[in-house]
């Protein structure tokens, strides 16, 4: 799928342009104002700021890891001339930014006082909007008459989870491949059943430089048969110990791959030579 048609050239424009308008419509009807707080490894931040710019009832604050997003995306976030948009550089990784955001939302008193809301894929509206293009793509590719598979470059697991949710809704998807870069915790988990945290390594695909994928909890919820207490226990143990292992972990129709920085330029060159089509480093991680 070509998902670079939005104003910031990120696939997240498809969902966030809708979500920004939904926020504006509902808030105006209610006479309310919200403070949106989000974390980004690059593409979410620029797409969210663009979607919320100049919205009268929204203040948006986006945290990004200093020196770990692409120069283009940093400029997209920091050069918007809009009084309600705020981009904040954090000394750390995307996971550090995400932990700060989660901490704010977990502080009930602070959350209510500031009327916090989210545009990250923590917000279910983001995932719902992304389900749509999987349905459209599958139908155009011949579903249900022919099996359709998707290989998805994956960082925070929101996009590929939208594909999985589409399958759960009845879309005849044959296979989903979770493409990772050198920050390969998801690849290792699908291969071994063990989640084991490592340091975040800067790569040629910076929007995927993530170790703890928020949306993976949603997949675990289904794997653990809807037992939310069990999911909480697993994730708390994982965050405190840095690892968690399942016996016989398997998600039907899902697998994973890992692409290193050495392989990314080779894949880009091979795709160009064979198809005369130029893919970006993130797409290369799922090719």
What are the roles of these predicted feature ranges?
Residues 1-287:
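PLP-dependent amino-acid enzyme catalytic core
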